[in-house]
């Protein structure tokens, strides 16, 4: 607390510097990045609807725990989903007891989101929660993209 007394900051505000080597302008890079992320999220939602995304019971001591395996995905998609799941279902609605993301090794193509529920829950409810936050993330990147329209 003592060290935070003199600290002035805006919560959840991040400043980035984007530099280019000249092939694309900064605005084009941001626009393309938002489009790619929106497409990834749409593909993720389709995979959820088709039951392609592996949702496994976690082999941990945490009760009501599931692992969502993100195949061929890393921090870009995983941390977005983890953050939104955490904010919505852990911090606000308090139906999660745990929410975390891990990529076990840089050479692995897969990463894992681990979620634990307060009460016993089936995989369909988990898939619905994932679908909800993926839709929210897609909307967020759509809003960000409007700032970088050409």
What are these language model-derived features?
Residues 1-150:
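Protein-protein interaction/assembly regions in multi-subunit complexes
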């Amino acid at each position: 607390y003592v060290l935070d007394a003199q600290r002035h900051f805006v919560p959840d505000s991040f400043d980035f510097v984007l530099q280019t080597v000249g092939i694309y302008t900064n605005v084009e890079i941001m626009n393309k990045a938002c489009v790619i992320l929106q497409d990834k999220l749409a593909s993720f939602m389709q995979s959820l609807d088709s039951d392609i995304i592996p949702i496994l019971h976690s082999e941990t001591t945490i009760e009501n725990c599931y692992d969502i395996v993100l195949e061929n995905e890393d921090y870009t998609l995983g941390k977005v989903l983890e953050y939104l799941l955490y904010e919505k279902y852990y911090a606000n609605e308090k139906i999660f007891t745990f929410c975390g993301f891990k990529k076990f090794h840089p050479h692995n193509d897969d990463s894992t989101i681990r979620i634990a529920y307060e009460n016993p829950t089936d995989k369909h409810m988990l898939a619905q929660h994932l679908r909800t936050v993926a839709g929210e993330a897609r909307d967020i990147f759509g809003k960000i993209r409007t700032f970088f329209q050409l």
